[in-house]
């Protein structure tokens, strides 16, 4: 990356890679997007590249889960909850899908800045 600043999609909470100490902030941000239990594993805390890889896998799994829920919502929820609740559920899943897509991009950008796995 150049001195022009971070690329579009870079997380606001993480300073650009040119900034001193950016990796420390990146590690905290990545941990925030992983299961809390990951904090207890020394390799995850000591190896930012491992953490970034795990965060990518985690976000991808969340995205797949949201897609799976979206595909099943009408069938599974419709008969008992009705069309209004199903529509609200689908809207929530659409919003979550958009959030996760943006998060996936941000995690990938941080991972690329940290270096190859």
Locate the predicted segments by residue.
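Eukaryotic low-complexity, intrinsically disordered regulatory segments enriched in serine, proline
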Residues: 17-117
């Amino acid at each position: 990356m150049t001195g022009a600043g971070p690329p579009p999609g870079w997380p606001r909470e993480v300073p650009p890679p040119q900034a001193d100490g950016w990796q420390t902030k990146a590690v905290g941000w990545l941990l925030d997007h992983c299961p809390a239990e990951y904090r207890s594993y020394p390799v995850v805390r000591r190896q930012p590249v491992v953490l970034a890889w795990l965060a990518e896998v985690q976000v991808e799994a969340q995205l797949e889960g949201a897609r799976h829920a979206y595909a099943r919502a009408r069938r599974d929820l419709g008969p008992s909850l009705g069309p209004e609740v199903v529509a609200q559920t689908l809207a929530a899943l659409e919003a979550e899908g958009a959030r996760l897509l943006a998060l996936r991009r941000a995690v990938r950008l941080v991972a690329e800045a940290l270096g190859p796995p």
